[in-house]
Swiss-Prot record:
The lineage of its organism: Eukaryota, Metazoa, Ecdysozoa, Arthropoda, Chelicerata. This is Dermonecrotic toxin LarSicTox-alphaIB1aiii. It comes from the Eukaryota. Keywords: Cytolysis, Dermonecrotic toxin, Disulfide bond, Glycoprotein, Hemolysis, Lipid degradation, Lipid metabolism, Lyase, Magnesium, Metal-binding, Secreted, Toxin. Binds 1 Mg(2+) ion per subunit.
Length: 273
């Protein structure tokens, strides 16, 4: 999965997908009542990027729905996964469940079109704080009470705080999650970060009793760091330059071993050689 980083304006969906992304990451900010409000990152953000592009969250979802609904004039067949980077740092811990409920209702109405031929992309809810694990239960509860529990088949999870792998496993246990787990590791492109924790996550993914299904690394903009991440065995790379990742995947060393994921590749299944 080539994951286009910080796609917060509808126009950027086309831009990043046309550069080679089959997945995008979008920032979601919340108001003081835990309603998802804007797709917005703000400053500081990655080096070389504009940090202030934004849409109202529900409007972004409508644009995203068009981009992922077969037959729509804006449809991109290869856009198959969306990571919502949930900026829950502005919320109190006891608002996490409410944030999940409100997020689910927004997605149901504006992205899934109330279950009637909505957008088809898989969705990852990426939560920065382990203490906010109740967001997951709130999300599930809202979809269930609205009569669409089947949409949970399209939803996965990530805790993005670079926490100890054991602590993350524990948070999932508390959240009642057994599957659909992506594990992120990374840092802004302005700084360097080693691959030690990525290797631990990959080892967990490949063990018989691990909780992780997929591992992605962020934010990678250079060819050499792309190669290093692929050598470590990641499933996804988040980038500001999808074309750079696509170029490296075309190199002979990687062409035989990796391919770009399509809609038929289940993002919740651990890949077995």
């Amino acid at each position: 999965w080539i994951m286009g980083h910080m796609v917060n304006a509808i126009a950027q969906i086309d831009e990043l997908v046309n550069l080679g992304a089959n997945s995008i990451e979008t920032d979601v900010s919340f108001d003081s009542s835990a309603n998802p409000e804007y797709t917005y990152h703000g400053v500081p953000c990655d080096c070389g990027r504009t940090c202030t592009k934004w849409e109202h969250f529900n409007e972004f979802l409508k644009g995203l729905r068009k981009a992922t609904t077969p037959g729509d004039s804006k449809y991109h067949e290869k856009l198959v996964l969306v990571v919502f980077d949930l900026k829950t740092g502005s919320l109190y811990d006891n608002q996490a469940s409410d944030a999940g409920k409100k997020l689910a209702k927004s997605l149901l109405q504006n992205y899934w079109n109330n279950g009637n031929n909505g957008g088809r992309a898989y969705i990852v809810l990426s939560i920065p704080n382990l203490a906010h694990y109740k967001l997951i239960a709130g999300f599930k509860e809202a979809l269930t009470s609205e009569g669409h529990p089947e949409l949970m088949d399209k939803v996965g999870y990530d805790f993005s705080g670079n926490d100890d792998i054991g602590d993350v496993a524990n948070a999932y246990k508390k959240a009642g999650v057994t599957g659909h787990v992506w594990q992120s590791d990374g840092i802004t492109n302005c700084l360097l970060r080693g691959l030690d924790r990525v290797r631990k996550a990959v080892a967990n993914r490949d063990s018989s009793n691990g909780y992780i299904n997929k591992v992605y690394y962020w934010t990678v903009d250079k060819r050499q760091s792309t190669r290093d991440a692929l050598d470590a065995g990641v499933d996804g790379i988040m980038t500001n330059y999808p074309d750079v990742i696509a170029d490296v995947l075309n190199e002979s060393a990687y062409k035989a071993k990796f391919r770009i994921a399509s809609y038929d590749d289940n993002p919740w299944e651990t890949f077995k050689n």
